[in-house]
């Protein structure tokens, strides 16, 4: 039982550690968007971006297994931060739109804009 649990946990950790990561972010005061740039795992190569306004999420990711794009009203999304992973999930279907590695410091900055 213990070895099975250890195997499952190591699989979860290894797959989550290969996620793309938040490389930098900025707030565009002119247009009211938080712009988050995402880079590939173990690289500085940009592979997507996430934009959050006061009522909408726009994302475009082409980062290995984290692929997708969309525009979704914030009222239909639940943001989550757990174990250095920032994700957005549909409140209706439960579908996870994206998951990216993110430090606590980065998330504290992002959180200011998603909790407005």
Feature names for model-found ranges:
Residues 44-49, 54-79:
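Phosphoinositide-binding peripheral membrane targeting modules
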Residues 4-48:
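Anionic N-terminal interaction surfaces
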